[in-house]
Amino acid sequence: MSKTYHFIGIKGSGMSALALMLYQMGHKVQGSDVEKYYFTQRGLEQAGITILPFDEKNLDGDMEIIAGNAFRPDNNVEIAYADQNGISYKRYHEFLGSFMRDFVSMGVAGAHGKTSTTGMLSHVLSHITDTSFLIGDGTGRGSANAKYFVFESDEYERHFMPYHPEYSIITNIDFDHPDYFTSLEDVFNAFNDYAKQITKGLFVYGEDAELRKITSDAPIYYYGFEAEGNDFVASDLLRSTTGSTFTVHFRGQNLGQFHIPTFGRHNIMNATAVIGLLYTAGFDLNLVREHLKTFSGVKRRFTEKIVNDTVIIDDFAHHPTEIIATLDAARQKYPSKEIVAVFQPHTFTRTIALLDDFAHALNQADAVYLAQIYGSAREVDHGDVKVEDLANKINKKHQVITVENVSPLLDHDNAVYVFMGAGDIQTYEYSFERLLSNLTSNVQ
């Protein structure tokens, strides 16, 4: 039976994906948000989903209302109106927890790599069988006939606790979100609580010391590069400018050679996790092998374009571990080019907590350009940290730039420009693209 769904904050990455999925399942969908453009809204617009400004008149008691986690009565008129008038709504993660009960559900959790791995698993499985999925890049697919549901499982504020999937991957555990988590131990405890809710199979990166301590009632399968102690092992790596080829063994049994057209050691691990899960769930590895070959990645994860013969990479990396992985991928694909990092720190709390780690990660590039720190809506700038504090710790060529003047980036020949961040780093990227386009109109 068709329902009408209203999304408060429909442009959020998870919210937009869920809206698309429900729309494709035959439901009526609309939503509200701020006017500012977000990359997630293009898919909504292409589907013809109405995006309204926030207004209490948008709400109807007959709708099922899903509210973004950032919105409260003190910062959103629709939430305030709903609370005052007894109109019920569910938060995104609450809705998802009940929704997935009707499917064979497969979650992907982890401090880093969730979106890429969810995208890879969704791509492969949806080419094998009818599958609905939610990816953290704002992509969603829904089918009324789907048996399987793949989703991204987010640890922030323990939002993944309503989820009880049959299968789940945990890519890694790392200290992040210092505005919520107090320590690495706090992060571990959240993941360990989540792991106890998996029912059929948990797949964890075996070379992560924290993940080795995870406990679950479901069978735990470890994956990694090292043969000792891991169940699924990737070996015989061949990393080239066209992607990565590797062999996977399961407890000594050769499962064959696989190829992915993506870059970086982290993506080999992501693929090994996907292979392990689908093998354990009983899927034909020949089909898995075939469809891994065609996985091109997800939005804002090593997204490439060429402007005036200049390679520009856009990536969501906003944690030191992610920066290192992205720069490693860039060197694999472009071994003869200079790697220029253009990075915007995201949140003051994260920048303070990980300042030295950010400097170490960015020093993997050949040159570094920094944008001003992008503060979260959840925090206030108390002046405790400035981007210059990070710049002072970088030992490669570096400079702080503004969106109005990105011309210092032109100082490099034969370079790849890697724009990284979770704020509005894309405005710097677009400014640079306009600068390049003004030099010549040759745009691909």
UniProtKB/Swiss-Prot annotation:
Keywords: ATP-binding, Cell cycle, Cell division, Cell shape, Cell wall biogenesis/degradation, Cytoplasm, Ligase, Nucleotide-binding, Peptidoglycan synthesis. Its main location: cytoplasm. It comes from the Bacteria. It is found in: Cytoplasm. InterPro entries: Mur-like_cat_sf, Mur_ligase_C, Mur_ligase_C_dom_sf, Mur_ligase_cen, Mur_ligase_N, MurCDEF_pg_biosynth, UDP-N-AcMur_Ala_ligase_MurC. Pathway: Cell wall biogenesis; peptidoglycan biosynthesis. ATP binds at G110, A111, H112, G113, K114, T115, S116. The keyword Ligase applies. One of its GO terms (molecular function) is ATP binding. Its EC number is 6.3.2.8. PANTHER family: UDP-N-ACETYLMURAMATE--L-ALANINE LIGASE, UDP-N-ACETYLMURAMATE--L-ALANINE LIGASE-RELATED. Cell wall formation. This is UDP-N-acetylmuramate--L-alanine ligase. It comes from Streptococcus pneumoniae (strain JJA). The lineage of its organism: Bacteria, Bacillati, Bacillota, Bacilli, Lactobacillales. The gene is murC.
